[in-house]
């Protein structure tokens, strides 16, 4: 059976196993267990056969509910081999949230682990007659299988299922490869459809920016139900590089793994990198790139990276663009602190005003993205798809600008814009001023309801370790640095900012804190 898809794309793992079967595909950091590409290919063939025996066919939606582990890696490649659509679900969600996502995703089978079995069973239960999936039909029970010995009778054991014969699926670039749910910062999470072409284009453009080679070893310590973690597995098979898998993030263990396994690359959110720098004197010299996304890279963190020669690559991306949109290399990141660099290969970014027209260099507006990494839309939600796209591409909802060097700067979400007394305030601008205070480590700025002005500016600040920071200190710092209407009228101090699993500030939680 040909490994090549009709229009030139390939089964990456099968091809890699044929080209370099003895190359190391995967290392489990906890015990140094290694898999060559031939080993992994054989294991994936068995997993694909077991999924087929449980009824998964080409085009079906395969749900996965587990944290990062070797079994998850096998499921990713097995889904691709079957031509099934991978649907990774966030293992940290509450049962009702999972049930809603399972209904939207129209799953054929949900695969779990021991720790998520109870949640998987709850999410798979038949829904009420007034509850429906994306096509409007009532949702019945979804079969559940576990990669671990199951505790419940309805749950099948994937390991004990006799594999069926599998013929590798022939797929085109326009076929869906995955559905990933957004983090929900704009309301109910939506299922982002990503095609095989999206994934391939993202992998290639990222390789150009990072200089990826088969000799790379990429530490995987992010959750694989987010694109930042999933992309490491998908790309490594294309590059022929090695995944060093750490199940569950621990800052000290991650730093140790980088040194022990000569890791050259790692994907992190800023909080994770900050904790790693706190936990160790120096990161190993083998490290060639630290892809930093999920939240802005603050100046304080960039300063620490420059001082300690950490090759940080601040990146801007989203699920809808299959991860990266723009990425700065270290020299650029240190010289222009706060930028996310230039758009990746094949990616076009246009900054537009409220009417959708392009603005001049240096002017602020919404970032609109076009290119082969951009999703064709949201599964089962044509209304959301239509609303997200315009003549120039995907409207990201992010506010930023392009400088005269072509670099992109991201300020905040468009809907986060505060309108106070008829004046527009961009939270990112205010937060940057707050972070300039020597005793402020981080800050989040939100709009709060105000009877007189419609909204007022609120700020939650995190002091530096050991610093004593008062509300008055913050207010005095803003005088002369911000126009009166931009200054925070409500200020709170906290040890940390509330964040989602992907590192994004939970703005509603900030508002709740400031309202108390």
For each predicted feature, which ranges?
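Conserved pre-ATP/AMP-binding loop-to-beta segment of ANL
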Residues: 4-6, 21-24, 129, 162-181, ...
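Gly/Ser/Thr-rich phosphate-binding loop
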Residues: 238, 263-268, 272-335, 348, ...
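AMP-binding/adenylate-forming catalytic core of the ANL superfamily
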Residues: 93, 371, 376-377, 387, ...
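Conserved AMP-binding/adenylate-forming core of the ANL superfamily
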Residues: 5, 22-56, 60, 65-69, ...
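ANL superfamily adenylate-forming
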Residues: 115-174, 188
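Conserved AMP-binding/adenylation subdomain of ANL enzymes
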Residues: 200-217, 224-265, 275-280
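Conserved ATP/PPi-binding loop(s) of AMP-dependent carboxylate-activating enzymes
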Residues: 342-346, 357-388, 425, 432
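Conserved AMP-binding A3 loop
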Residues: 34-38, 170, 175-204, 506
């Amino acid at each position: 059976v040909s490994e090549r898809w009709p229009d030139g794309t390939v089964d990456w793992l099968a091809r890699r196993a044929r080209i370099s079967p003895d190359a190391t595909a995967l290392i489990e950091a906890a015990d140094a267990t290694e898999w060559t590409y031939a080993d992994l290919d054989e294991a994936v063939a068995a997993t694909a056969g077991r999924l087929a025996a449980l009824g998964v066919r080409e085009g079906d939606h395969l749900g996965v509910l587990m944290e990062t582990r070797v079994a998850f890696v096998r499921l990713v490649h097995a889904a691709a081999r079957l031509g099934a659509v991978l649907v990774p679900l966030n293992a940290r969600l509450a049962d009702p949230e999972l049930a809603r996502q399972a209904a939207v995703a129209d799953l054929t089978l949900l695969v779990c682990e021991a720790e998520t079995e109870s949640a998987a069973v709850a999410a798979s239960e038949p829904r009420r007659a007034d509850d429906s999936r994306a096509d409007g039909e009532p949702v019945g029970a979804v079969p559940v299988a576990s990669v671990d010995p199951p505790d419940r009778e309805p749950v099948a054991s994937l390991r004990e299922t006799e594999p069926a014969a599998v013929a590798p699926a022939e797929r085109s670039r326009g076929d869906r490869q995955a559905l990933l749910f957004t983090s929900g910062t704009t309301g109910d999470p939506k299922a982002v459809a990503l095609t095989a072409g999206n994934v391939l284009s993202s992998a290639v453009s990222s390789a150009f920016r990072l200089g990826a080679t088969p000799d790379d070893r990429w530490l995987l310590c992010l959750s694989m139900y987010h694109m930042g973690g999933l992309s490491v597995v998908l790309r490594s098979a294309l590059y022929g590089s090695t995944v060093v898998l750490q199940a569950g993030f621990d800052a000290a263990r991650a730093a140790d793994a980088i040194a022990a396994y000569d890791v050259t690359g790692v994907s992190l959110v800023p909080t994770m990198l900050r904790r790693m720098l706190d936990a160790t004197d120096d990161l190993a010299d083998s490290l060639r790139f630290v892809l930093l996304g999920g939240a802005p890279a603050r100046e304080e963190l960039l300063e620490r990276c420059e001082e300690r020669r950490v090759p940080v690559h601040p990146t801007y991306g989203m699920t809808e663009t299959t991860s990266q949109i723009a990425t700065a290399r270290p020299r650029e990141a240190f010289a222009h602190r706060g930028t996310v660099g230039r758009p990746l290969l094949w990616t076009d970014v246009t900054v537009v005003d409220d009417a959708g027209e392009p603005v001049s260099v240096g002017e602020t507006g919404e970032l609109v993205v076009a290119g082969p990494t951009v999703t064709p839309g949201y599964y089962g939600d044509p209304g959301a798809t239509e609303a997200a796209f315009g003549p120039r591409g995907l409207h990201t909802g992010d506010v930023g600008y392009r400088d005269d060097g072509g670099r992109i700067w991201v300020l905040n979400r468009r809907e986060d814009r505060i309108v106070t007394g008829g004046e527009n305030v961009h939270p990112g601008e205010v937060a940057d001023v707050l972070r300039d205070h020597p005793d402020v480590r981080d800050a989040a700025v939100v709009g709060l309801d105000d009877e007189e002005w419609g909204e007022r500016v609120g700020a939650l600040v995190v002091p530096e370790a050991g610093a004593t920071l008062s509300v008055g200190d913050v207010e005095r710092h803003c005088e002369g640095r911000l126009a009166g209407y931009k200054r925070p009228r409500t200020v709170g101090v906290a040890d940390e900012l509330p964040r989602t699993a992907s590192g994004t500030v939970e703005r509603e939680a900030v508002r709740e804190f400031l309202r108390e």
